[in-house]
Amino acid sequence: YYDRKKNNYTFISKKQDAIPSDIIVCSYKDSKGRLWFGSYGNGAFYEQNGKFSKVATTYEQKYSIDYVRCITEDKYGNIWLGTIMNGIYCLDNTGNITPYTMEKTGMLTNSITTFSCADGINLYIGTSSGLYCMNTETKEISLLENNNSASNLFEEVHINCIYQDTRGLLWIGTRKGMDVYTTVSVPYTTAVFGGE
């Protein structure tokens, strides 16, 4: 990390027994000021007051939280972890972990690529098979589909990244460009920059 006051960098590694993994793929700062990190192979962990704490990597012996690709928080302070092949996990304020896998939710895949929860209630879930929305209050999940025609809603179903702006627009990065989707009743737009 970089200390602005001292103008120096500090290297933190697994070799120093400071963190559980050296392969960090995502980070998130929650409302309590904790810095969360997702890793390949050793799950999620967070830093608070200079100390790192690890989240359990197995749940009920059949769910693995080893490969965490994305992290976000809802308005209730629940932490959501998206994994590469094992779905979504919610850590509530009491430390309980709840899995949301394709077997339990009806999603087409357990490969979670990205999250956005800008309003604190609607968790937009990017996957290798489309974009879903979960209401974090009711836990209902729906696939965002194009109801106006037989065509797919998005140019590409593999969602790489999502950003929700202050207008409610979802900026969705895919392998074939960018889609802009609105959460209000306005048509979406597909944009391809410099491509075919």
Region locations from a protein language model:
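Carboxylate-rich, polar loop motifs that coordinate divalent cations or form catalytic acidic clusters
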Residues: Y1-E196
